[in-house]
Amino acid sequence: GRGGFVRRVAMIKEERKRNPDLLYFDSGDFSQGSAYYTMFKGDVEIGLMNLMGLDAVTIGNHEFDFGLENMARLFRMANFPIVCANYDFTGTVCEDVVKPYVVLHRNGLKIGVFGLSPKMKGLVADKNCEGVKYLDPIATARKTAEVLKKKEKCDVVICVSHMGWADGKEYDANVIQGSRYIDLVLGGHTHTYMKHLEYVKDLDGHDVPVDQNGKHAIYVGRIVMNLK
C-alpha cells in the first residue's frame, strides 16, 4: 500500500493505545500482491500481519495460490485465528487450522466472528484446493449467525467476508438478505472502495452495514459500533 506495512503497524499500535478494545480484521487475499510473496510464499506477509495484532482473518482465493500444503503452513505461523464457515476442510491438511468462527471478548461483551469465502471454481486451480468442499454461503451464514447469537450468546455478530460486493448470486448483499443476527459485514474480493457504509436489510428487515476498503492494503477502515 501507499503507507507500507511499517506505517500500518505503527498506526494500529497507536489506535490500540487510544482504544484497548479495538478489533482488527482482514477480509482475505493477504497472501498475494508483491514479489515477496512469489519469492517467500507468504512468510513475509504473515510475519508482518503478526506484528499488527489481528483478531481474525478470513480466506481469500489467493491464499490457495501455492496449494493447500503451503496455505496450512502459513496458517500455522499466524498468531491470529483463520475463520471460514463455508469451506469444509475435513480430511485435508487445513482441517485443524481453520475454524468456522471465533468468540472474542471486549469490555464485558462477547463478539462472534465468522468468515465466508467465494466459490473456488474459476478462481482457484483444482489441484490447489483438492478435497475442500464449498458450502452454500447463504445457508451457512444463516446457521452460523444463529449459533453465535443463540448458543454462544454473543452480543455482536460480525461476518468477515471475501464474497464480494456486486449484483449477483452469493455476494454480501445476498448473504445478508438470506440471514439474520448479523450486525456487521466487513467485505473484500471485489476491490470495492466504499466512501460510506452500505446497508442491506436482513430477513427480519434490519439494516445491516457493509464496509469494504478497496485493494492492495492502501486503506484501513475504521468503524465505531454503538450498542443499544
Spans of features found by a protein language model:
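Acidic, metal/ion-coordinating pockets
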Residues: G1-K228
